[in-house]
Amino acid sequence: MSLEIILTEDGSNSIKNTIIDECYHSTSGAIDESQHIFIQNGLQAINKKTINTLEIGFGTGLNALLTQIECDKKKINNNYHSIENLPISSKDYKKLNYCKQLKVKDDRFLKMHNSTWGKETPISKYFNLLKINIELEKFNLKTQYDLIYFDAFSPNKQPELWTYNIFKKLYENLNTDGILITYCAKGIVKRTLKEVGFEIKSLAGPIGKREITQAKKK
């Protein structure tokens, strides 16, 4: 991969994949975007004290870090599974300024990145992480989840991940009242989610984005 560390408008870093010309986060603000989409409209929408979470795209680890912070604060047990086909290098993740921006120590963030792929690792009292180095299409889901962070590259860049078959697989491995949350608000994506069986809500997006999509299994 050819990656470049960039600075977004809220002062936090993101990474740009220069080969496909796409950033891992909104340039309007990486932390603001992840907090708004995945924490406020994902994690906080699940009313449980023990949550199984699946993340599609570990990326920089920002969603995992924000989730761990929120779960520790609210005393929510989170079994967090994250799929990533192309992990970033230690050279890159050590440059990211999330912990400085969030005013937290970097030990847990580094522990997430340094944890062994394919092995569940306790990051804090309430947060266990399992990173899986595999393509989503090849991943055999064995867990029923309460929450899915769908944070893959956009449909224009990774169309193979935004299909009926992928969403159907995720739907079948989501508990009743479980939520799939994504930054993508494209009509074709919402129609596909609805066709699979999800109940769709278009929610206000973070700064720089008009809408996001929350899909619930009923």
Language-model segment annotations:
Residues M1-I51, I69-Y98, L102:
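Rossmann-like AdoMet
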Residues G57-G59, E84:
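Conserved S-adenosyl-L-methionine
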Residues G61-L65, P87:
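Glycine-rich SAM-binding Motif I of class I
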Residues D92-K142:
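S-adenosyl-L-methionine
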Residues L147-Y149, T176-C184:
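Conserved beta-strand signature within the Rossmann-like core of class I S-adenosyl-L-methionine
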Residues E160-T176:
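A short glycine-rich, Lys/Arg-flanked "PGG" loop and its adjoining helix->strand segment in the class I
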Residues V196-K218:
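Core SAM-dependent methyltransferase catalytic element
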